[in-house]
A protein has these predicted regions:
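Ribokinase/PfkB-type carbohydrate-kinase core domain
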Residues: 1-9, 70-82, 94-234
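Short, conserved phosphate/pyrophosphate- and ester-handling motifs at nucleotide-, phospho-/glycolipid
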Residues: 46, 184, 251
């Protein structure tokens, strides 16, 4: 199976303060600088499973861009670079429970519609370029014109809880006609404009709006729910003894594992196959949340190229 991923690649600065931030003060912290980005995270996790993957992303020829290119090449990810004037940076502020709050300086993915491999077996699109007003409309049109043999998954992009941006994103998703739509619970609430009460209800409500898609709503330790295409499933989260350290990239790991498990199977998947895929995705997402960094390696993943 070959996968093309359209999405961001960023330099991540992960900050774990030793205590509450003090306005005007100085708080000791653990700070890690590493490769990240929703699109790159998915691509790297897929490559570590031995899947041929191509990443369409925007990188500049600056120090950060050179670092990220080298890291992706070591992971075996084929790059189709959209040359940018700067490389995106994300600061992830991690609280005492491992939950992250992000401060982002993302770079629009201008021109991605001319680079994506529409003949891939599976095409995955990060939500950030689809939500961006500079790239979203052209990208949605390109995705909607893909080959009928290419499966498309679309992820959320930290949707703003405001009616305007969420409605625009929903329209672009509808134009892209994804086979699989992946949203966090907060993203699902923004997408619908209201909290439907449960993940299962959220997934069902979104599936009614996107009748050609299988919709998955995830909530980390709260599990996940799927609806659409005649399927309706709820899966518990994987339970690990170790505490969560950094949730950054856990959802991207979930997406990568789900694609790896479902790719090559008949569509829509059988309920049993989807249940197994959701369990495997939850397991990888949980393990990634127990390490620091969105692309930090976990047990069982292939080592990078020398």
């Amino acid at each position: 199976m070959g996968v093309a991923v359209v999405g961001d690649s960023t330099l991540d600065v992960t900050v774990r303060p030793s205590g509450p931030l003090l306005p005007g003060g100085d708080v000791p912290a653990s700070i890690v600088i590493s490769a990240g980005g929703q699109g790159a995270n998915v691509a790297v996790r897929l490559a570590r499973r031995g899947i041929a993957v191509r990443l369409v992303s925007s990188l500049a020829d600056d120090a950060a861009g050179q670092l990220l290119r080298a890291a992706l090449e070591r992971e075996g990810v084929e790059l189709a670079v959209v040359e940018g004037t700067a490389t995106g940076t994300v600061v992830a502020l991690i609280d005492g429970h491992g939950e992250r709050s992000m401060i982002s300086d993302r770079v629009p993915l201008d021109g991605a519609e001319g680079f994506a491999d529409l003949n891939a077996d599976w095409l995955h699109c990060s939500g950030y370029p689809l939500a961006n007003d500079r790239s979203g409309d052209a990208l949605a049109a390109m995705l909607g014109e893909r080959s009928v043999a290419t499966r498309l998954s679309v992820a959320g992009g930290s949707l703003e809880p405001k009616p305007g941006p969420a409605a625009i994103f929903a329209r672009r998703v509808a134009r892209a006609h994804p086979d699989l739509l992946l949203l966090s619970r907060d993203e699902a609430t923004a997408f619908l404009g209201a909290d439907e009460g449960s993940m299962a209800a959220q997934a069902a409500a979104i599936a009614a709006l996107q009748p050609d898609a299988l919709v998955l709503v995830t909530a980390g330790a709260g599990g996940s729910a799927a609806a659409g295409l005649g399927l309706s499933l709820v899966a518990e989260a994987a339970h690990l003894d170790r505490p969560m350290l950094d949730a950054t990239g856990a959802g991207d790991a979930y997406a990568a594992a789900l694609i790896a498990e479902l790719g090559g199977r008949t569509w829509p998947p059988a309920a049993a196959d989807l249940q197994r895929a959701m369990a495997a995705a939850s397991e990888l997402g949980a393990r990634v949340a127990r390490v620091i960094g969105a692309q930090a390696r976990v047990d069982g993943e292939a080592e990078p190229l020398p």
